[in-house]
């Protein structure tokens, strides 16, 4: 750590949060989890272990739909775990999918697989007694869930661009390298869940009981990383703590990355010390310094991030405390090189290309729309069986996108008809509106303990109502990026939507508008604590104006800004909560 400890380290004068004690006492994340696994009196974990399992990629949850009923019967809530796999760039092999599907059907309460907007899959409803078998299964097929939650670098995103196959492969390889480089070295995960068996992807990193990058108390808070390939911003690159924007040379080869830091979308209702934020640029690094830059940012956050107040512990708050120049200087000191000036780039869109596209390598790629990422079997749509049948015959790979969809990638010309026939048979190819195609939600109720309102379960009908509004005003073929999140923690990325709903209470939401299509602008609160029907009515009025008053090809989010319906968020740490404080030239 630098000797200059004043700027950015004022939090050290306050008591540390209890999470810091927990990590210190955890014996490198082992805790007493093994003892809890033997305790059949409860379906959950006790004491510190409730938090420690998050470092191993799990959260304890319960079915909130039946919580009151079980309370009346004097039973504890129906506890189970969420498991989030580590899957850099979202690439998974068909043979892996077949095993994942089997476990979901046989051992999870909801018999479903949830694709997330962080390019991985989650199990919901895993009973405690099935946790070790689940981790051993993942290990046996070359997967794990290390560091997909808690105070570590989480699953690394990478643009799912099937057309630019060579560039995507180069960027994807760096996403994997970044993920591996920033993993914890502790053997705790292996000792608890795999009984010390060799892990194919991470074993070399976990042999030494030391944490030279993360430190023995790991990071102050969650840490998210993404790799984006312009012009597609499907990973919402401005929404993460650490971001790498791929830059090509004159021959179209990857030559390095622009590095951005300090993005993040979580905040707390009414707490003006919290705010969502788009990332800032540190500059450009050539390929050979990519891992050094990643390590430098992590070490700077490790040493300067707030360990007293977890609500102000993400990278954006560290930058606010240190200033951007101060943060950059510390990162440069850690990696022992200077950033070069930011290279030019442009993002134009962030949605997936639903349907077939052909890559420059002449392979075909089929992007399947999966509403809210939920893969399950319903009588009218047996999607889960459909993906399983695809996995049985597909010779390429699957790619989970940051928009919660699934790409059947690298399909040869002669296999295309068979893949399409299976997808159509099981309802995986369907006609949907542009609005629905670009909509997203978090899981929320009934499993998320933080949920204040519904999200995934209300999204389909809500989008249907908005489709009617767009048809009414003759703009049914247009797209408005719409997202619902059940609380302000930001999992649904609603704060980068043109229309964003943030749960406030059961049946009530805050309506935010004014984000842009490329994901460069935070949306602003427009109406507070209103019902879904009231939101539809508000959007009806706004779309009526947009349909008649917009400029050529003007997006909805840009229109509401230009028309002074809502003020833009220019510098979120200053004006997110109060638009009268907008100072366009403000520099941190």
Curated annotation (Swiss-Prot):
GO terms for biological process: cysteine biosynthetic process; hydrogen sulfide biosynthetic process; sulfate assimilation. The keyword Lipid biosynthesis does not apply. One of its GO terms (molecular function) is metal ion binding. It comes from the Bacteria. It is an enzyme of class 1 (oxidoreductase). Gene3D superfamilies: 3.90.480.20, Sulfite Reductase Hemoprotein, domain 1. Its EC number is 1.8.1.2. Siroheme binds at residue 491. Binds 1 siroheme per subunit. Binds 1 [4Fe-4S] cluster per subunit. InterPro entries: CysI, NiRdtase/SiRdtase_haem-b_fer, Nit/Sulf_reduc_fer-like_dom_sf, NO2/SO3_Rdtase_4Fe4S_dom, NO2/SO3_Rdtase_4Fe4S_prot, NO2/SO3_Rdtase_4Fe4S_sf, NO2/SO3_Rdtase_FeS/sirohaem_BS. Keywords: 4Fe-4S, Amino-acid biosynthesis, Cysteine biosynthesis, Heme, Iron, Iron-sulfur, Metal-binding, NADP, Oxidoreductase. Pathway: Sulfur metabolism; hydrogen sulfide biosynthesis; hydrogen sulfide from sulfite (NADPH route): step 1/1. Its cofactor is siroheme; [4Fe-4S] cluster. It catalyses: hydrogen sulfide + 3 NADP(+) + 3 H2O = sulfite + 3 NADPH + 4 H(+). [4Fe-4S] cluster binds at residues 442, 448, 487, 491. GO terms for cellular component: sulfite reductase complex (NADPH). Alpha(8)-beta(8). The alpha component is a flavoprotein, the beta component is a hemoprotein. Component of the sulfite reductase complex that catalyzes the 6-electron reduction of sulfite to sulfide. This is one of several activities required for the biosynthesis of L-cysteine from sulfate. Belongs to the nitrite and sulfite reductase 4Fe-4S domain family. NCBIfam families: CysI, PRK13504.1. This is Sulfite reductase [NADPH] hemoprotein beta-component. It comes from Actinobacillus pleuropneumoniae serotype 7 (strain AP76).
